[in-house]
Structure formats: structure tokens, C-alpha cells
């Protein structure tokens, strides 16, 4: 049985349709990422899954149950960690954990949870004295206290330093390793590639692509990217998309307004000399040139025309 089944989901506000008939499923034990620019509909979708919003149309099932029929049982089997969870600052870490334990018929011991999130030494510290990373780990511990089957994480590492981010990644992977299902939204492509078994890219209320990060990257038709920019006056040298797509081993070209460009290529050793020769023939000097492996970010920009962190 899938942990999550979504069929024909729609959500409208007055004349605006935020979610436009999306359908997807999430397997038990899977980390599933919802990616999309601001306003794409991903937050609305997640809030419907969490039982915060009611859909305008469509069906949502979690663990074979629906919010309309089984709200009390579902509340006991999901955990939710928001991007910024407000916790009482004048309570200690242990007091907050015991407060959240009181909400569930079954719960994990405080000492065990604090060990999992590496906060044992902060047990008696006030919440108001914790760092940003420590607060976020505490929020996830609160989400895990009721032994959930599904964990919802809304941009869990936004604003955290790299070390805190990786500590949270380890938490997610341990939860998945124990059989839990995770629904994740994030603005960090590295995070999605590291954690997610599958992702769905949402834009304008519709899922425009779904699959594993590796599958989506392969869908570009090439595994490498050449990024370059032309110097000042050379930026208007007349290099058009058709010129770049005609280069050997080039499968895609993205031109930016500032003269920068990214090419997806199957064989950099063939494409690079041809690109340099093209620029030289047009009298265009390269200000920057680099090659790298294609990433999920390249997939996202190709599909939406925007970077994930764009507003």
C-alpha cells in the first residue's frame, strides 16, 4: 500500500486556482520532494496533505485513510515540522518534549528522542537560548514524538549553517531507514538530490515532471553543463540559441539577459573547442567558462525558466 495517494487534487481561492488537478502517489518508506518556485502550489498541496486545508476537488488518502473520515487517527500517525516552528521560549527542552508527548496516546521517551537529535546536553536549557539549528532539531523531535508513519518537513534547513543542515539530513535518512515516509519541500537542490528518492516539480499548480533525481537529470539528454559569459561589448556579438544548438554534442541552450549562457552537452571534449571557435569567429571574448556535471537545478531551470530560489 502506498503511504500517500493523491488523485485529481484542486484548490481554488475566489477566481485563482492554486492547485490544478494534480495526481501522484508516495510509496511507504520513501522520501518524496515537492519542488517549485514561490506561488507554484506546493505549499497549498502540502497543507492539504497535512489536513490544514480542505481541497476544492479531488481525493487524498494517507495510510489508506482520509481526513474526512479518519481525522483523529491520522493526527496520531503523522508528524509535521514547519519551516519555523514557534516553541515556548521560557520552557526547557525537556518540558517542551513532555508537552508534545501529552498530545499522543503513544510516544517515545524524551531521553531517546533527544539522543536522536543530538540535544541530550540541552535537556535543561531554555528554548530561547538554543541556536537556530538546535531549535530546528527540537522541532523535528517534537514532530517525531508520536512515532509517526509519515513526516512532513517544510523547508526544514532554510537559514541553517552547513553543519546544522547535514545534521538534519542525517535525521531524515535515519527516519526513512526505520521505514518512515517523508514528504519534503525545499529550496535547496543539493538537499533534494541528497535526500529524495523521487521528486515532483510543480509550476502554476500542475506537476510538470516527476521521477528520481537521476531520472530527471538523464531526461536532459546530457550529463554535463558548460556555463560561459562574454566580456562587456562582446555580449552583443550575436550568439543566438540556434548558433549554440548547432554546436556538436550540444543538446540544450539557456540564454540569460546578462549575456551568460548554459549549454547541456553530452561530450564536453567536442563541444568546448567548437564553442571557443564560434566565439573567436564572432570576435567575442569569453569572460568566464566552466564545465560541471548536470544537476537537478538544471532540470528545474529548463522546465520552469526559473531557479528554485527565485521569487
Model-assigned labels for residue ranges:
Residues 268-311:
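C-terminal coupling/interaction segments
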Residues 59, 225, 285-288:
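Residues at or immediately flanking beta-strands
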Residues 67, 103, 233, 268, ...:
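Short beta->alpha junction loops/turns
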Residues 170-266:
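ABC transporter nucleotide-binding domain
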Residues 79, 101, 105, 218-222, ...:
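A generic structural signal for secondary-structure junctions
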Residues 2-6, 11-209:
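ABC transporter nucleotide-binding domains
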Amino acid at each position: 500500500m502506498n503511504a500517500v495517494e493523491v488523485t485529481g487534487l484542486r484548490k481554488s481561492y475566489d477566481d485563482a486556482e492554486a492547485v490544478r488537478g494534480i495526481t501522484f502517489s508516495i510509496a511507504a518508506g520513501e522520501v518524496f520532494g515537492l519542488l517549485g518556485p514561490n506561488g507554484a502550489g506546493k505549499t497549498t498541496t502540502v497543507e492539504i496533505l497535512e489536513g490544514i486545508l480542505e481541497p476544492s476537488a479531488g481525493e487524498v488518502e494517507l495510510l489508506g485513510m482520509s481526513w474526512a473520515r479518519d481525522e483523529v487517527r491520522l493526527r496520531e500517525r503523522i508528524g509535521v515540522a514547519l519551516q519555523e516552528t514557534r516553541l515556548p521560549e521560557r520552557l526547557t527542552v525537556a518540558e517542551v518534549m513532555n508537552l508534545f508527548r501529552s498530545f499522543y496516546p503513544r510516544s517515545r521517551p524524551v531521553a531517546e528522542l533527544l539522543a536522536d537529535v543530538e540535544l541530550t546536553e540541552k535537556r535543561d536549557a531554555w528554548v530561547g537560548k538554543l541556536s537556530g539549528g538546535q531549535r530546528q532539531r527540537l522541532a523535528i523531535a517534537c514532530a517525531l514524538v508520536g512515532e509517526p508513519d509519515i513526516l512532513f518537513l517544510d523547508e526544514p534547513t532554510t537559514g541553517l549553517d552547513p553543519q546544522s543542515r547535514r545534521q538534519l539530513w542525517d535525521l531524515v535518512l535515519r527516519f526513512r531507514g526505520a521505514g518512515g515516509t517523508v514528504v519534503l519541500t525545499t529550496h535547496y537542490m543539493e538537499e533534494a538530490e541528497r535526500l529524495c528518492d523521487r521528486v515532483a516539480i510543480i509550476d502554476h499548480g500542475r506537476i510538470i515532471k516527476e521521477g528520481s533525481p537521476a531520472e530527471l537529470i538523464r531526461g536532459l539528454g546530457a550529463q554535463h553543463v558548460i556555463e560561459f559569459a562574454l566580456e562587456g561589448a562582446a555580449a552583443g556579438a550575436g550568439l543566438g540559441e540556434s548558433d549554440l544548438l548547432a554546436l556538436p554534442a550540444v543538446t540544450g541552450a539557456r540564454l540569460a539577459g546578462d549575456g551568460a549562457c548554459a549549454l547541456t552537452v553530452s561530450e564536453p571534449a567536442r563541444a568546448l573547442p567548437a564553442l571557443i571557435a564560434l566565439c573567436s569567429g564572432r570576435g567575442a571574448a569569453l569572460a568566464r567558462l566552466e564545465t560541471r556535471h548536470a544537476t537537478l537545478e538544471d532540470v528545474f531551470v529548463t522546465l520552469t525558466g526559473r531557479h528554485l530560489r527565485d521569487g
